[in-house]
């Protein structure tokens, strides 16, 4: 820790969530929860974010507003690392999924680069283009450089720029000095230009050649977005689960991977490491298998979302309901209920009983309750909601 002390103070009706003054963080009183609100709500992410600012924001601070991601992106990233360390990989990945969603909402509202000198007021820069996308950029740098190269670069950047102001080029110099890699291509596409890749992916298997062919197109509008060069994780299940890395950089590419048998599952961009939109030729059967068998929670969530767009309503509803009641991770169960809501599914008596007696996570229960908006307002629904209001331990 770089300073002589660290204190936190709660400020009533504070206009921000938190403010990282050197050695004394101000937090809003909205971060204070009573015992009934835990564990459904937590301030851990905010507390970790503001503490991370003591290094990235105070010990080192951005030279200008255009590079504010060096403060906010780093703090958001390190906050997520804390959640991952404290609660596990699935929890950290779900935080990252919400970063992806936040970044894409911001991009839809206003497309702009992360490093942006084109603004009227500094306040307009404080969006998911710098918080969420900045955090995602650091995760992708971690994948490109590897764990050792990434952390040696961050250490070099922190030590060399202690008590100085910085711009993005200073981080890039530390990476080049430490690893010897020229990452012009990475910084240009993710920091100095706006947007994200959109992939259209299909695959087929050649039994005679024992070969899986993956056809990848980048289909983003090249008038507003560049082509992206990125390492992509491919997960294959052909009796055992194997992970491969392919480098996608062209408009249209075909990649061939040896496989002794036809894969039961092929996942492009496994774990959603690259923020992107993905279109595939996966059938309902493919998505059902992925929903049940993908080892990464984000890949199961993606399958649930895609199933909500498919025809074959009853078999899709059955798969989603089975996931909602059996997946090991609460966020996947919650997202499955959200997908059922998009299908305007109606629940049976046993589904209400299952929520009453088996679902232990209040956040998943909340998602189920939200999905009742499409349920007929009969006596069973009214009784269920009344029981929740009267007897449930959660707000």
Question: What does each of the following model-derived ranges do?
Answer:
Residues 1-216, 266:
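Hydrophobic alpha-helical and helix-loop surface patches within well-folded domains
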Residues 23, 329, 360-367, 374-377, ...:
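C-terminal structured domain segments across diverse proteins
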Residues 37, 143-144, 306-309, 342, ...:
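Alpha-helix C-terminal capping/termination sites
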Residues 52, 148, 161-350, 354, ...:
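Non-catalytic accessory/interaction domains
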Residues 349-356, 381-389:
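Alpha-helical repeat scaffolds
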């Amino acid at each position: 820790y770089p300073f002589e002390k660290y204190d936190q103070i709660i400020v009533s009706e504070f206009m921000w969530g938190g403010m990282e003054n050197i050695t004394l963080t101000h937090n809003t009183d909205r971060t204070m929860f009573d015992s009934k609100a835990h564990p459904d709500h937590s301030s851990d992410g905010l507390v970790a974010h503001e503490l991370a600012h003591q290094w990235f924001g105070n010990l080192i601070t951005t030279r200008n507003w255009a590079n504010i991601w060096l403060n906010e992106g780093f703090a958001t990233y390190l906050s997520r690392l804390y959640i991952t360390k404290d609660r596990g990989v699935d929890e950290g990945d779900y935080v990252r999924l919400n970063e992806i969603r936040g970044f894409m909402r911001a991009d839809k509202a206003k497309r702009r680069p992360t490093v942006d000198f084109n603004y009227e007021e500094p306040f307009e820069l404080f969006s998911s283009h710098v918080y969420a996308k900045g955090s995602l950029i650091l995760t992708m740098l971690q994948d490109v450089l590897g764990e050792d190269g990434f952390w040696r670069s961050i250490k070099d950047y922190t030590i060399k720029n202690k008590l100085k102001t910085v711009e993005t080029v200073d981080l890039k110099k530390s990476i080049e000095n430490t690893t010897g890699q020229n990452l012009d291509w990475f910084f240009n596409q993710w920091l100095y230009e706006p947007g994200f890749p959109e992939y259209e992916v299909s695959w087929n298997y050649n039994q005679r050649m024992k070969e899986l062919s993956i056809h990848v197109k980048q289909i983003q509008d090249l008038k507003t977005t560049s082509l992206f060069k990125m390492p992509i994780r491919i997960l294959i299940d052909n009796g055992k689960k194997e992970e491969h890395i392919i480098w996608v950089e062209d408009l249209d590419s075909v990649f061939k991977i040896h496989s002794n048998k036809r894969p039961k599952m092929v996942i492009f961009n496994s774990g959603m490491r690259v923020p992107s939109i993905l279109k595939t030729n996966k059938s309902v059967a493919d998505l059902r298998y992925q929903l049940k068998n993908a080892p990464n929670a984000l890949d199961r969530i993606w399958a649930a979302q895609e199933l909500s767009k498919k025809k074959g309503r009853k078999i899709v509803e059955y798969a989603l309901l089975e996931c909602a009641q059996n997946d090991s991770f609460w966020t996947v169960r919650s997202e499955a209920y959200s997908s059922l809501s998009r299908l305007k599914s109606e629940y049976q008596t046993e589904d209400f009983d299952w929520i009453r007696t088996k679902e232990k996570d209040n956040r998943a229960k909340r998602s189920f309750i939200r999905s009742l908006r499409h349920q007929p307002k009969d006596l069973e629904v009214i009784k269920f909601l009344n029981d929740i209001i009267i007897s449930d331990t959660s707000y």
